Amino acid sequence: SGFYGYWCIDYASVPIILELEQNSDYVIRIVQPNIPQNQRWKPEYKDQHIDSLFALSKLKKTSASLIIWPEAAYPSIWPNSKKEFNDIVKKILVNKSELLSGMLRFDLDKKLYNSAILFDTNGESAGIIDKQKRVPFGEYIPLRDNFPFKNLSLFGNKMDINIGPNKGLLYTKDDIKLGIFICYEIS
């Protein structure tokens, strides 16, 4: 069963869409395109990934109040790709949906964060939550400056993901509170 579980996690490419209806007025659509890890950040797959997110977000006939994309769903760093991303988001949010997307982002000091960003019905950022518990050797090198491997690269440069300043809750336009845990923080 362990082999089957590994295969399901690593090789299954079945996209997942889950809709949660608390009542008939508020629909949450959770989208999981199941992009293979070895393709996630390759530029030649970027358009394919975006098309997949877009298609799955629009798949159901009913419009969603909130669409949720997974951690690091968008294959670019925000806000470097802000105009491109906002153009895509505006196409998805035509029915006045909001979007919660996991993404890597830079701040004004060019520090890198793993974040969840809530986009309002106009495609503008309405709130940010940053990851607080990083994965050692996956998102940062512990004690990097004290060891000879301080020049080891995680993301094609010597940049670690930082613990972000934004924590707490996000609020939708309907004043629904969203408590966000990103990946490793759930454990």
Task: State where each predicted segment sits.
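Enzyme catalytic cores with a strong preference for nitrogen-chemistry domains
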Residues: S1-S187
